[in-house]
Swiss-Prot record:
Protein residues bound to Mg(2+) 2: D121, D274
NCBIfam families: FGAM_synth_II (TIGR01736), PRK01213.1 (NF002290)
EC number: 6.3.5.3
EC supergroup of this enzyme: ligase
Lineage: Bacteria, Bacillati, Bacillota, Bacilli, Bacillales
Gene Ontology BP annotations: 'de novo' IMP biosynthetic process
Key words, A-Z: ATP-binding, Cytoplasm, Ligase, Magnesium, Metal-binding, Nucleotide-binding, Purine biosynthesis
Protein name listed in UniProt: Phosphoribosylformylglycinamidine synthase subunit PurL
Length: 739
């Protein structure tokens, strides 16, 4: 039986539009735009297209702060992914996307379809996906549910990425109690493209057919975008129908077929876009709106895998592995023949019109007819009230945290056992990071590196964000996230080019949360301007709260850099006994927001570590110069756990040791001061390296040793640790916690 849909009168009087996600004022605005009351289908279209997830209605004023232009930018925000120029007619397309709410409800499918969606965003631009990264947040690994979420999310990422044949080469994971009921799953995809092949998501040319390609439409994921735009509750776990189910093998076929169309039929392809959040309504209305055109869709022609689907369900379904193409009139047969070779369905479901209306026809009747710009462009924009949280001033005035360091080696071991610091090998070993055989630096170093076939170049890539610093001070923390990403790229031999941002925050209707969003954007913008890394794509995920408890502000920074010559590739691990160890940067007693403060105090508080962007940029440029001149054997940025953790990590891979004398007291061994790098150079390169760095705060600490022992001295203080012991703790912590 067909579903009986509510009448316009019932929608208004019973306020059914509220259940669908529209406020009273938004419903009134829709009525005024249409000059009448919307029917059920139209109400659904507006509710999903005006959700935060699709319209950015709460975050647009903040997003306008970001610098988005630069000579390296080929495509900025507004399309499926951003693209930067790497020379020789090549570009790199990349974007990060969140799938947080679905991953709490159905962690395997939530994570898997997050991967599938971001891959489609990248190949819809005309780029071949060459790598995946992720940024994950979970609660502490002390409850069965947290362990279950970690295992299932990682399995979902691996299941989809491994099956489709795209290597998962890097990422980051942090564990904090605020993520227990609000896990974050951010996936980033990087693709390679010839600049001449860049596509747009547009439907233009009056009478041109619009084609639906890929999997059939089912009832999965209806209102997924609205679901991602509201606060969570315990009952939210029941919303499994709003989570989509993915098929990576179908996506692999879709990827190859779409790239074939772009390569061989670019003369007849007008536009291409994936069906992601809000499914068919979002992709089709956006494509028409961007081109200043209208659209007429015949819902009877939409491939359906379930019986009696209504236009409402077909338009809002978020079934996976579907694309929308606009092609030139008279060429449908060629496109269908190509998709046919891949065993994929490709059908005409509508055409471009010149009236700027979005018209939906079903069984010969017009079931929706609304201005296309009203859906895709004209959602109301809210300037939310913003209030500094009381904690911020308290943190500014608080006395700095001083750690208890009676036994330095014991503290060292405890830190290396913390899951945020410990080796993530247990996680990344589940990912195929060598498929396609271009991965030059595998997971576990500062940045992942993928070779560009047919050239001497490589792409460095990383995801970063220490959300604890943002909790203390969102502006400083936002800048640190960008600076750390750039540090990771530089340490690997790359020049930072641009970022994609995954802005994960709590409920923006709370003024304190909106303040966090604004301040984080200010910090990110300042760092991007200083480091010349414009924001070229991104994603906003708000309402990451459950039962009123929100997450730390977590703007994940995905950064891509260019390694101009494969010879410049540098990793974090010491290479040779006898190499000279240097520390670049100043160490202060900065423990607020640190892993050690969390460990010893059970919570974080106080003033965030300082960041001087001018100094940061100078150190990065000098280090990159030294790397490009072939002077650097290893390079590692100092992050969580500070110098002590970075030094230990540098010894682990080759089973080496270190004998160093540091310029700071041993109680600062685990300080998290910013803008610091641990570097090793061959003795014959020491003089030239020192000359490059001579005006800066650079310290010659000592040498790499052949024995598996670390000796650290400061004046009369000395501490010795076995790297074998440290490594076994570091490697064993996560497998042990997940048991």
């Amino acid at each position: 039986m067909p579903n009986m849909e509510p009448t316009t009168k019932e929608i208004k009087e019973q306020k059914i539009y509220q259940e669908m996600g529209l406020t009273d004022s938004e419903y009134e605005l829709v009525c005024s735009i249409l000059g009448r009351e919307p029917n059920y289908t139209e109400t659904g279209l507006f509710s999903v297209m005006w959700s935060e997830h699709c319209s950015y209605k709460n975050s647009k004023p903040v997003l306008r702060k970001f610098p988005t232009e630069g000579k390296q930018v080929l495509q900025g925000p507004g399309e499926g992914a951003g693209i930067v120029d790497i020379g020789d007619g090549l570009g790199v397309a990349f974007k990060v996307e969140s799938h947080n709410h679905p991953s709490y409800v159905e962690p395997y499918q939530g994570a898997a379809t997050g991967v599938g969606g971001i891959i489609r965003d990248v190949f819809s631009m005309g780029a071949r996906p060459i790598a995946m990264l992720n940024s994950l947040r979970f609660g502490e690994l002390d409850t069965p549910h947290s362990k279950y979420l970690v295992s299932e999310v990682v399995a979902g990422i691996a299941g989809y990425g491994n099956s489709i044949g795209i290597p998962t080469v890097g990422g980051e994971i942090q564990f904090d109690p605020c993520y227990t009921k609000n896990p974050l799953v951010n996936a980033m995809c990087v693709g390679l493209i010839e600049a001449k092949d860049i596509q747009k998501g547009q439907a233009k040319g009056i009478g041109n057919p619009v084609m639906y390609v890929g999997a059939k439409t089912g009832r999965d994921g209806i209102h997924g975008a609205t679901f991602a735009s509201v606060e969570f509750s315990e009952e939210g776990e029941q919303q499994r129908s709003a989570v989509q189910v993915g098929d990576p093998f179908m996506e692999k076929l879709l990827l190859e077929a779409c790239l074939d169309v772009i390569r061989d039929h670019s003369d007849i392809l007008v536009g291409i876009q994936d069906m992601g959040a809000a499914g068919l309504v979002s992709s089709s209305s956006e494509m028409a709106s961007k081109a200043g055109a209208g659209l007429e869709l015949i819902m009877d022609d939409v491939p359906q895998r379930e019986l009696n689907m209504t236009p409402y369900e077909m338009l809002l379904s978020e079934s996976q592995e579907r694309m929308l193409l606009c092609v030139k009139k008279g060429h449908v047969d060629e496109i269908q023949a190509l998709f046919d070779r891949y065993g994929l369905e490709a059908v005409v479901i509508g055409k471009v019109t010149d009236d700027k209306m979005y018209k939906i026809i079903h069984h010969g009747e017009v079931v929706a007819n609304v201005p296309v710009d009203a859906l895709a462009e004209d959602a109301p924009v809210y300037h939310k009230p913003s209030t500094e949280p009381a904690r911020y001033q308290a943190f500014q005035e608080e006395q700095p945290f001083v750690p208890v360091m009676e036994d330095v080696v014991e503290v060292w071991k405890e830190l290396l056992a913390q899951p945020t610091i410990a080796s993530k090998r247990h996680i990344y070993e589940q990912y195929d990071y060598q498929v396609r055989t271009d991965t030059a630096v595998v997971p576990g170093s500062d940045a992942a590196i993928v070779r560009v076939r047919g050239t001497e170049k490589a792409i460095a890539m990383t995801t970063d964000c220490n959300s604890r610093y943002l909790y203390l001070d969102p502006e400083v923390g936002g800048a640190i996230a960008v600076a750390e990403a750039a540090r990771n790229i530089v340490c690997s031999g790359g020049k930072p080019l641009a970022i994609t941002d995954g802005l994960n925050f709590g409920n923006p209707e709370k003024p304190e949360i909106f303040w966090e969003i604004e301040k984080a954007a200010d910090g990110i913008s300042a760092a991007c301007l200083e480091l010349d890394t414009p924001v070229i794509s991104g994603n906003v995920s708000l309402y990451n709260e459950t039962d009123g408890t929100g997450i730390y502000p977590t703007p994940v920074i995905g950064m891509v850099g260019l390694v101009e010559d494969l010879a410049h590739i540098t990793t974090q691990d010491f290479k040779n006994s006898g190499d000279v160890i240097f520390l670049i940067g100043e160490t202060k007693a900065e423990y607020n927001g640190s892993e050690l403060q969390k460990l010893q105090q059970g919570k974080i508080s106080g003033r965030a570590p300082e960041l001087d962007l001018t100094t940061e940029k100078k150190y990065q440029e000098l280090l990159l110069t030294a790397i490009r001149e072939g002077l650097v054997s290893s390079s590692h940025d100092l992050a969580e756990g500070g110098f002590g953790v970075a030094l230990a990590e540098a010894t682990f891979k080759a089973g080496l040791g270190a004998d160093v004398e540091v310029p700071f007291a041993l109680n600062q061994l685990f300080s998290e001061s910013q803008s610091r790098f641990l570097v090793s150079v061959k003795p014959e390169n020491e003089a030239v390296f020192a000359k490059i760095m001579e005006q800066e705060k650079v310290y010659r600490l000592g040498v790499v040793t052949a024995d598996e022992t670390i000796r650290v001295k400061y004046k009369e203080e000395e501490v010795t640790a076995s790297t074998t012991d440290l490594r076994s703790i570091w490697e064993g912590a996560i497998p042990c916690l997940l048991k």
